[in-house]
UniProtKB/Swiss-Prot annotation:
Family: Belongs to the methyltransferase superfamily. PrmA family.
Assigned EC number: 2.1.1.-
Coiled coil: none
Pfam families given in the database record: PrmA
GO cellular component labels: cytoplasm
Intracellular or extracellular location(s): Cytoplasm
Taxonomic path: Bacteria, Pseudomonadati, Thermodesulfobacteriota, Desulfuromonadia, Geobacterales
Record's catalysed reaction(s): L-lysyl-[protein] + 3 S-adenosyl-L-methionine = N(6),N(6),N(6)-trimethyl-L-lysyl-[protein] + 3 S-adenosyl-L-homocysteine + 3 H(+)
Function: Methylates ribosomal protein L11.
Protein's name in the database: Ribosomal protein L11 methyltransferase
Binding-site positions, S-adenosyl-L-methionine: T149, G176, D198, N240
An MF annotation (GO) of this entry: protein-lysine N-methyltransferase activity
Keyword entries, A-Z: Cytoplasm, Methyltransferase, S-adenosyl-L-methionine, Transferase
Highest taxon in the source lineage: Bacteria
Length: 305
């Protein structure tokens, strides 16, 4: 089989993964694959393990791979906090190898106790007791691998445990739905009335497609409806967006909560948690919990009667 692609893999500290992935995507003109793992980068026993992300990109032939590697190496060396875990690795792939290689990075992901996110080519896997969400990687709107999404899903799972007849009455809002993953999870966990909104029309199209793929389109309404035009009485509101946006939207979010309802806020860096908590302090809310995953935080509030 004739080689048609160079595969380049870099190991970088997890906190730099997004920066490096964006750079490699721009440089290669193709998508990138990011895989998180723990690697002991040092031999002394008293030095802790570092969280490492393995980022893989692809260059189509013909190309001057030596020049590309020099650019990558120079970019990495200039990053603050970059500690080389291993030099970039290069291999040649044929067309069929490339098609299967990127898929190898994406496997079913179990979240919490009752959810399983799987790409479409892995749908044969069923975990007993888990609701299966089918989402393919590569979309720009989220597939569940990021800490912010996982925290939201774990918190949501803990809330959607009443008897089925009670779940049917729960009205849910997914604010900034992206791929629709949170709304789909809510439907898979038994909710029947879900509004999924996003300011990006393309995100709404993707969310609608994913709802149809997961056979929950009859439970979820996807739209670009602005927050101020939505109704109220939501028992659960999910918002996985930037901390500053959460604070700006706080009055509109809280006013749409039902008394006793839950609010799940994610997309919050640890250093921004105080900003968000201060922004929601003036409202009639009870702070329930702060969940942590790496540098990210997810906050759970309840609306006071």
């Amino acid at each position: 089989m004739a080689a048609t692609w160079y595969q380049v893999t870099c190991d970088v500290p997890a906190q730099l993964a997004e920066t490096v992935a964006d750079y490699l995507a721009d440089l290669s003109g193709c998508g990138v694959c990011t895989e998180n793992r723990d690697v002991d980068s040092f031999s002394p026993d008293d030095i802790p393990e570092l969280a490492i992300s393995q980022i893989t990109c692809y260059f189509s032939l013909p190309c001057r791979i030596e020049q590309q590697l020099a650019q990558i190496t120079g970019f990495l060396a200039a990053l603050p906090g970059y500690i080389p875990a291993a030099p970039p690795r290069v291999s040649l792939l044929g067309e069929e190898d490339w098609a299967s290689s990127w898929k190898a990075h994406f496997k079913p992901l179990a979240i919490g106790q009752r959810l399983l996110i799987t790409p479409s080519w892995e749908t044969g896997r069923q975990d007993e007791g888990r609701a299966v969400i089918v989402l393919d990687p590569g979309m720009a709107f989220g597939t569940g691998g990021h800490e912010t999404t996982r925290l939201c899903l774990e918190c949501l799972e803990g809330l959607l445990v009443p008897p089925p007849e009670q779940l049917e009455q729960i009205k849910i809002l997914d604010l900034g739905t992206g791929s629709g993953i949170l709304a789909i999870a809510a439907a898979k966990l038994g909710a029947l009335q879900i509004d999924a909104v996003d300011i990006d029309p393309q995100a709404v199209i993707v969310a609608e497609e994913n709802c149809a793929l997961n056979k929950v389109a009859d439970r979820i309404s996807c739209s670009t409806t602005p927050l101020e035009q939505l109704g109220d009485g939501y028992r659960i509101i999910l918002a996985n967006i930037l901390a500053e946006e959460l604070v700006r939207m706080a009055p509109g979010i809280v006013s749409r909560m039902a008394p006793g309802g839950s609010l799940i806020l994610s997309g919050i860096l640890a250093e921004r948690e105080a900003l968000v908590r201060n922004g929601f302090d003036p409202f009639p809310l009870s702070f329930e919990a702060s969940l942590a995953a790496g540098e990210w935080r997810c906050l759970h509030y309840r609306r006071l009667p």
